[in-house]
Amino acid sequence: MLKSYRARKKPAYNAACFHAQQCAEKYLKARLVEAGIVFTKTHDLINLLSLALQVESTWASLQPELDALNKYAVEYRYPGRSATKAGAKDAVADCRKIRGFVRAALGLPV
């Protein structure tokens, strides 16, 4: 993700946004699995958040970041729209915030 964002000659901002979404998704799913919460196959971060709120009520504050990342599951994955440097930077920052919350909940170093 950071490699895509930091590339010098041809930054892959689309890839950075997509991978930020994927990273957040995998972290949320890890917390759900750890808590024994069953979920269906989905890439919808808001759906995953609603399930996680059963065990992590303070995570409601993550909704703005998850809303922003949610669109990257498909929006920039296919030709058409392109992410900007600012958008990629925001996506990486949002992902890092979510990562911190989940790692703390799992007792891992943040």
Model-derived regions, located:
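Terminal alpha-helical segments
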Residues: 1-110
